[in-house]
């Protein structure tokens, strides 16, 4: 009869591998900003950076923003300022750092529990010692590490999508602000011409060369252009403030300058891909779709564990060493043994957890 000999070295090796896996989990020093930057670098202007976490680097970034604001802002500079200074993006990236810390916490093994007891009666004194820890947390660590990696990849892709969305919104706001400024300049010229026409009509009517009807028409044109000028000023102010909001500017910084007219259409814009190639590229490169795929993969892998984890999620393993000492003779008896705690699924069969995973 062939007997299987249990090799303690295998158990020790497996335990060491699991502990090493737990020890590898660490918080990213930059709050995963580098990972977000790698997903977005090719779609952002050259030199565009995300808000730094270091206080000294933050002060240097604010100094660069002040330097850029001294000159009329082009589109790329507006995007750079928005990425460095937008408070919403800063909060989103800070949340990503918190999620990274939660990932490390989820992969950290729970501390073992040491229980000490001392019981005395008239005949003997008993000392109880027990060391216990959660067995499920230790066994499932490799799977939980994989799941947490999927979740963090999804969170990173979502944050990268937020970065690209802010950059696109800033580009649109810059175009609208410059276009509104250009429209305001045209409205001012039209109003000046209408004022000159109304003044000429007034003088011509004074000497009898214009009728009252002709003068009234010129005055009506002047009033129409004045109303159009007021609307253009309101639109230019609103678009300017919208751009300032996206760039995170306030106070004296909102008095930044913009170009007087829109730039020419870039030559690359006339060579955009169309048809099936454009659709395939969009489906392949959209970060929000990639994030949804990772979320779907994560839910699919965790679905099978949801029910079992809800039922057997509190399995514990403990080692006990008790010493009983006879108070009369001083003789001590030592007992050693293992204990395992198994939850009994009398009330919770994991139906709610399984249903949640299926939704």
Question: Where are the regions a protein language model picked out?
Answer:
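"Short basic amphipathic alpha-helical interaction patches in structured regions
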Residues: 95, 130-131, 143-151, 190
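Periplasmic alpha-helical coiled-coil/stalk elements that build and connect Gram-negative outer-membrane
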Residues: 25, 141, 157-281
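Generic structural signal for well-ordered, non-membrane alpha-helices
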Residues: 73, 101, 153, 157, ...
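A ubiquitous short alpha-helical element
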Residues: 59-64, 114-119, 182-187, 262-264, ...
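Amphipathic alpha-helical segments that line or abut small-molecule/effector binding pockets
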Residues: 146-153, 157, 294-297, 357
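Terminal intrinsically disordered/low-complexity segments used for targeting and assembly
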Residues: 1-81, 233-281
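Amphipathic alpha-helical coiled-coil segments and their boundaries
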Residues: 75-78, 85, 92, 134, ...
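A small-residue-enriched
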Residues: 25-47, 80-137, 240, 244-249, ...
């Amino acid at each position: 009869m062939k007997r299987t000999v249990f090799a303690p070295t295998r158990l020790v090796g497996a335990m060491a591998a699991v502990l090493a896996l737990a020890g590898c989990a660490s918080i990213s020093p930059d709050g995963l900003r580098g990972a977000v930057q790698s997903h977005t670098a090719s779609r952002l202007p050259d030199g565009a950076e995300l808000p730094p976490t270091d206080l000294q680097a933050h002060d240097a970034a604010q100094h660069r923003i002040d330097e850029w604001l001294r000159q009329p802002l082009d589109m790329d500079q507006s995007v750079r300022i928005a990425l460095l200074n937008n408070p919403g993006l800063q909060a989103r990236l800070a949340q990503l750092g918190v999620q990274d810390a939660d990932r490390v916490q989820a992969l950290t093994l729970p501390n073992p529990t040491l229980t000490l007891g001392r019981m005395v009666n008239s005949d003997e004194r008993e000392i109880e010692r027990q060391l216990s820890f959660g067995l499920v947390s230790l066994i499932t660590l490799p799977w939980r590490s994989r799941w947490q990696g999927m979740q963090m990849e999804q969170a990173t892709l979502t944050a990268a999508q937020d970065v690209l969305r802010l950059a696109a919104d800033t580009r649109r706001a810059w175009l609208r602000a410059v276009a509104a400024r250009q429209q305001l300049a045209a409205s001012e010229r039209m109003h000046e011409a209408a004022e000159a026409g109304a003044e000429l009509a007034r003088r011509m009517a004074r000497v009898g060369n214009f009728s009252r009807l002709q003068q009234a028409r010129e005055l009506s044109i002047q009033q129409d252009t004045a109303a159009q000028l007021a609307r253009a000023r309101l639109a230019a102010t609103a678009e300017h403030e919208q751009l300032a909001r996206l760039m995170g500017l306030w106070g004296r910084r909102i008095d930044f300058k913009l170009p007087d007219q829109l730039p020419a259409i870039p030559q690359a814009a006339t060579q955009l891909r169309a048809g099936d190639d454009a659709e395939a590229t969009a489906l392949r490169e959209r970060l929000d779709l990639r994030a949804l795929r990772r979320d779907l993969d994560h839910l699919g892998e965790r679905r099978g564990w949801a029910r079992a984890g809800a039922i057997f999620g509190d399995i514990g393993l403990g080692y006990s060493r008790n010493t009983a000492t006879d108070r009369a003779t001083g003789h001590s008896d030592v007992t050693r043994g293992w204990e395992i705690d198994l939850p009994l699924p009398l009330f919770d069969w994991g139906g709610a957890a399984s249903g949640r995973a299926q939704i």
